[in-house]
């Protein structure tokens, strides 16, 4: 059963020290994927415990949840998204979280769409492009990388597939180890977990 209610045009929520500006969209997004908090906590600890400056590249970065978490942990972050509106929104979130003045790759985070088009009509199909893209990304990792994180909402990219790709592209080059698992949100009313895709993590 669905409960419907009126939403404000825009509102803010907080997660730890981060503040996010949310607004409803016709395509069912609000500007935040809260299930990603488990990944934010994971890489924030790695950044804080690195005991060195950490440069992070966040690809398909949307409104900047992972960007803000990495900034707040002390990293320097380059935020990349094809949508100019999403980049503007990410900047607004950075201002709200008092992180706008931090300097803009020991780590890469990516949240690729299943399908997309670039500003010049380029086509992105995750089944065809994701593995070559991961391989290209290994060329811009530092000599001593800290972590690599891939999120997937695509049915065909299950944890085992993510693990295989990361092992093939990254472990053979840098060593380290890989974990991959489904992620979800706890449903408080019945104790079940709402599936929200999968994540693959590499760490040194």
Across the structure, where does each feature detected by a protein language model lie?
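S-adenosylmethionine
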Residues: 102-171
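Conserved SAM-binding motif I beta-strand of class I
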Residues: 76-81
